[in-house]
C-alpha cells in the first residue's frame, strides 16, 4: 500500500497507461480459467506498482514476500471467484493511481491484500476443523474396534 501511495506521485501517465494495458491484457487469463498464467501476471502487476514507486527498499523487500506468496496465490486463484475479484480490484487500484488519489490507492491495495489474507485464514481454519473432525471419527472407530476385540 505504501508503494501505491508513492506511485501516485512518482509514476508518469505513460507508466500508468502501461500498467492498465498490462492488467487488461492479463485479465483475459482470469476469465478463461488460465489461472496459472493469471497468477503469474498478478504477481507482476504488484511488482510493477512497486517499480512505479521508485523506492528500491520497498521493491526488494516486497519482492521477497511476493515470491513466498506465489504458491499460495496460485492456489487461491482457483478457488471461488478469487481471480475475477482480483481483476476488479486491480482495475480499481489503477483508477485510483490514475486519479493520483494516494489515500484511495493505498487503501485499495491494503484491502486487496487483506482479502487474500482472509481467504487463506478461512481455508486454514476449515482445514484444521476438518482434521479435528477426522481425528474424532478415527478415535470413535478405534474405540469400536477395541470394544469388539473384548
What is each model feature region?
Residues 1-11, 41-80, 116-120:
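Hydrophobic, amphipathic alpha-helical faces that serve as interaction scaffolds
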Residues 16-20, 39, 59, 106-107:
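Conserved positions within tetratricopeptide repeat
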Residues 2-32, 37:
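Amphipathic alpha-helical dimerization/coiled-coil segments
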Residues 36-40, 60, 84-88:
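Amphipathic alpha-helical packing segments from all-alpha helical-bundle domains
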Residues 20-27, 32, 44, 67, ...:
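C-terminal all-alpha effector/ligand-binding and dimerization domain
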